[in-house]
Amino acid sequence: MKTKKPKIVCITGGKGGTGKTLCAVNIAIMFKNEGYNVLLIDGDVENPNTYLLLNGKLENKIEVPFFMPQILEDRCSKCGLCSQNCASHALLYIDDSIPILMSSLCSGCKLCYKICPENAINPDFKTIGWTYSTEISDLSLLIGELKPSEARSAGIVEKLIENLENDLQKEPNKFDIIIFDTAPGAHCDVELLIDKSDIVIPITEPTRFGKLDLGRIIELINLLKKDYKVIVNRSSLLGYKDQFLAELQEENIKVLGDIPMDSDIVDSYCIGKPLMDKENGFNNNGAGFIAFTHIYENLKKWLEFN
């Protein structure tokens, strides 16, 4: 079942623990159930766990290299040009001395390597993380993981996007739909994935903190000029659903659907079997199952899928 080109849906949210991965995995599964070719990309590189909800394993591990300048002391003229032009101040230069690299500040931009008049900088690299690719239950997964102690998470996300673009260049019609599962927050990792998406689905919850963080992610989405609709997860929490939905309506925030508390969702999460996978035998009349089905139908209409 093919569409003209793959639609890219970004599942995101302003805070951790709202159910982004839960929604991303189950939405991917529902498209898979209907014969669509689906790619799920886990862009929460500091805590990738989509594969856990699918009871799968990380496979096909590939290192992600990151540029680091190596200064050749025998060639360096001690001019200080590299330090003067380093935007992240990663090269410490004291008059008539060899610049000292502070690797934790280096952005990997390679400017120092390109402008050195003495060719005294060699390109060196360190591993900042890994990518994985696997197939689980006819679902394609691309996963990024940041190496512990490393801070350049955006470098892993950029590598995921690069891998995606290379795949689409080779096989433009390989996938019908691509789903991003982002990190929580409204930082550069999230911005990179939202910018590559056709539509965005922020996940929130009916609490004051949920509302506050939803506002932050919507501000970023609007800045990037993307269309979005919200999913309210745990909508029956604290009996605040009606008031919360009314507040969203007052602010002209469109809602794709809401998901109430349901023990089947908890069970599926714990055993690593998605609620909406037709082979897992969960109750089709359960509150969570019905809610996800409603969200899926609304999403297909939004995407103009037949």
Give residue ranges: language-model regions.
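C-terminal lobe/tail of nucleotide-utilizing enzymes
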Residues: 2, 220-306
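Walker A (P-loop) phosphate-binding motif
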Residues: 2-32
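Ferredoxin-like iron-sulfur electron-transfer modules
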Residues: 27, 31-34, 55-78, 89-108
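Short beta-strand-centered segment that lines the nucleotide-binding/catalytic pocket of NTP-utilizing
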Residues: 36-51, 125-130
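Iron-sulfur cluster-binding cysteine motifs and their immediate structural context
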Residues: 81-101, 111-126
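Hydrophobic alpha-helical segments and helix pairs
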Residues: 105-143
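Conserved catalytic-core segment of NTP-binding enzymes
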Residues: 118, 125-130, 155, 159-258
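Flexible beta-alpha connector loops of hexameric P-loop NTPases
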Residues: 145-154, 208
